[in-house]
Amino acid sequence: MRCWLENLSGGRKMKFGEFGGRFVPEVLIPPLEELEKAYDRFKDDEEFKARLEYYLKSYAGRPTPLYFAENLSRELGVKIYLKREDLLHGGAHKINNTIGQALLAKFMGKKRVIAETGAGQHGVATAMAAALLGLEAEIYMGAEDYERQKMNVFRMELLGAKVTAVESGSRTLKDAINEALRDWVESFEHTHYLIGSVVGPHPFPTIVRDFQAVIGKEARRQIIEAEGGMPDAIIACVGGGSNAMGIFHPFLNDDVRLIGVEAGGEGIESGRHSASLTAGSKGVLHGMLSYFLQDEEGMMLDTHSVSAGLDYPGVGPEHAYLKETGRCEYVTVNDEEALRAFKTLSKLEGIIPALESAHAIAYAMKMAEEMQRDDVLVVNLSGRGDKDMDIVRRRLA
């Protein structure tokens, strides 16, 4: 198999093929260059690595188990393993990245972090990491998400963060990102923008991917120990794409199908979805060239998903590259399919997944119909479903 990692280093090339880059106002070039130099310096620093490993183990709860879902496997007639990122402190994979970036900010001498959040998971994880490391935190949240994720808003405030609801635009994640970028322009001398996914201008997609790659590194060792070799496929949900990139990246050079599941919402034909790789086109937003849901003039379209964390009109540039080159496959699951998978996993395994993760479970259930009994699927269970209880209760009533 072609050595994909050589082509996906990011680094000073700033791009993944034609995707990525640094499409930002001139005023943001200095902080981005400062961040790139700091990351290049500290990522291999022994003290930085030791402290990161310590916090991931003793604070976040790594390594997470690779759980053989015995009941679900029996029901579907295929072996299904779940990478249990839902068991991390905070209930999702987001803490892998926030601890890494908050620690980097600390090593850079920054006093404050800002972040955007959709479902609230990244905001909570940022507030946790900031509290842990003694940093001031402000979280920007689209007003629509602010209303439907009130419990996470309370959590962030309890953890000491200031939460700002963004009323502009479509009042969702993309608008929260815009506000965070505006803040950073004015405050970068003492503030680090702790971006939550593999999106944004270089070097953010590379930094976030590297901090999330611990998922795939662990899963690779664990599946070899459990099955004696590689799985047939790895499945993960894709919004911005950080949990998927985290588990995919260490497997890029292996003979394994890598499948990203986008939010199909009410169906692609309806126009009410968040599937930018499936139905989008190339464009520029938030400092990067990637695939976006946009009209002919390049204006971003409104998105929809039952899952707030997948409700973003674009996707990380590395995913765009992996789609273009054919290394990864990207599919969709609609709201109803995700809700059915949410119920199925809860009843069969006693595990309540996040609605984001339920999209990946739903596609694994679809795939199982075409597979053999000894085939092996690994699903990244990126988060737990506590935050989604009210939404699911209303939808299933």
Swiss-Prot record:
Residues annotated as signal peptide: none
Xref: PROSITE patterns: TRP_SYNTHASE_BETA
EC number: 4.2.1.20
Pfam family, one: PALP
Keyword Phosphoprotein tagged: no
Pathway(s) the chain acts in: Amino-acid biosynthesis; L-tryptophan biosynthesis; L-tryptophan from chorismate: step 5/5
NCBIfam families: trpB
UniProt similarity note: Belongs to the TrpB family.
Protein name as annotated: Tryptophan synthase beta chain 1
Name of the encoding gene: trpB1
